[in-house]
Amino acid sequence: MAEFEEDLPHNGLMDGIASGVGVPVEALRLLLTILAGYPVAALYQKFISVIADKTVHHMFFAGCGAGLCYFNYGLDTYHSLIAILTTYFLVLLLRKKTQIFLAINFVFHMSYLLLGYFYTSSNDYDILWTMPHCILVLRMIGYGFDITDGLKEESELSKDQKETALKKPPSLLELLAFSYFPSGFLVGPQFPFRRYKAFVDGEFRQHEGNVEAGVRRFGAGAFYLIVCQVGLRYLPDSYFLTPEFAQVSFVKRIYLLGFWAKFSLYKYISCWLLTEGALICIGLTYKGEDKNGQPDWSGCSNVKLKLLETGNTMEHYVQSFNVNTNQWVGQYIYKRLKFLNNRTISYGAALGFLAVWHGYHSGYYMTFLMEYMVVSTEKQITRFYTKVVLPQWGHILNNSDIYKLLYFITLKSYNVVYMGWCLTAFVFLKYERWIVVYGAVSYYGFTFLVLWAAFYHTFNHFFRSSSRKLAGEDQKLQDSNTDKLVEEKKPEDKKSE
């Protein structure tokens, strides 16, 4: 694989600050770009939002976003320009040839992204032009679907499609502004062009409370960033590849891996929260009114903090983490596969798309495979617990305080321990790295899944079949008694007649 060298703008001050605080200069640029969303929001609200000419708004967003992109990636900014221009001209030429347009648009963007991954890939996460480009790929693919949905009759569209369909293609300047939106192009979130247009047209401006909500999100993001940095200082990734980790007691190993996974997760959460705070401050994220009649500014939220911190299962993590991207995949991939008439295949295809979208590393594919297997197993366990355990022992268990305490501890322990297993491959990426960590914890994740599958299917085969057989015998006995009773009554009936 070719060695990649990035052509970034030289900045001695940035290099000096980065070395002084002990972080890579690329990471410092990324953080500063995310934080730049707040002064950009202040400038827009103070000077630009009151200007009637919408062209000025589009120029402001396109210019700020492209400038911040250049600050991070230098001349590699041209990759995003190629992507935007390609989709723009494809719309001009092929919009009414729906299937051809969608196929070319999808294949072009995914192929370009995968080629980018191929030429820039390494053993670690790299803050290169491919990072914002993967966000842009989803935006351009989703935009393509919205354009073609605009050609359909209203009756042919789903509720989601009605909210995002575009009857009229935007201008090139509008598309550039939408694509380079300052607080949305780098790490997400995804939002449709219709939301951007409504925002620029002032449809959200009369609603209050966005600045306060944005500041709260900023505070949460700063808190998670601090916890992440402190936690990973004590539990760095490299520690889990060492012989010292493998020599720790098994229970301590799996708990250390679980807490490390939490801290690693907070790295992404902090970036999303800081970005969301800037988007809220600028006023893009209005969702409607909450149950108390107050403005709800969570329209671009990418994480559900309450569910993330109080959830007990991997499914809770899936529902609370990277919410915005999951919603995008649900709307533009999963639901578009409805013609397959099989939810399992559609779900598997959606997870496969997410894995490919992340890159070539085997860790991504193992992560999404584990997600599928673990969530499926959790559903089986829930079904077994509610259908088998509770009907027989529920009256005892539900009245026991000791059981309730043990139940809580078990779920929380599972939550921490299995999070470590599931996130290992995602962080270490390469097979030769994540398999070392799996081996160091004795492959406990695989072991549990195999043991549960053996038990569950054995139970279904023997106990369920015997239960059905017993139920059938009971029914036959009941039918026999009923017939006998009928026969005994017949003479009496004849006498009465």
UniProtKB/Swiss-Prot annotation:
Its EC number is 2.3.1.23, 2.3.1.n6. It is a multi-pass membrane protein. InterPro entries: LPLAT_7/PORCN-like, MBOAT_fam. The modification Phosphoserine is found at residue 480. Disulfide bonds: none annotated. During gastrulation, expressed mainly along the midline in the presumptive mesoderm. During germ band elongation, expressed in mesoderm and endoderm primordia and in the cephalic furrow. Expression in mesoderm and endoderm lineages continues during germ band shortening. At the end of this process, no longer detected in somatic mesoderm or endoderm layer with expression restricted to anterior and posterior domains of the visceral mesoderm. Its main location: endoplasmic reticulum. One of its GO terms (cellular component) is membrane. The keyword Lipid metabolism applies. One of its GO terms (biological process) is germ cell migration. Pathway: Lipid metabolism; phospholipid metabolism. Belongs to the membrane-bound acyltransferase family. This is Lysophospholipid acyltransferase 5. It comes from Drosophila melanogaster.
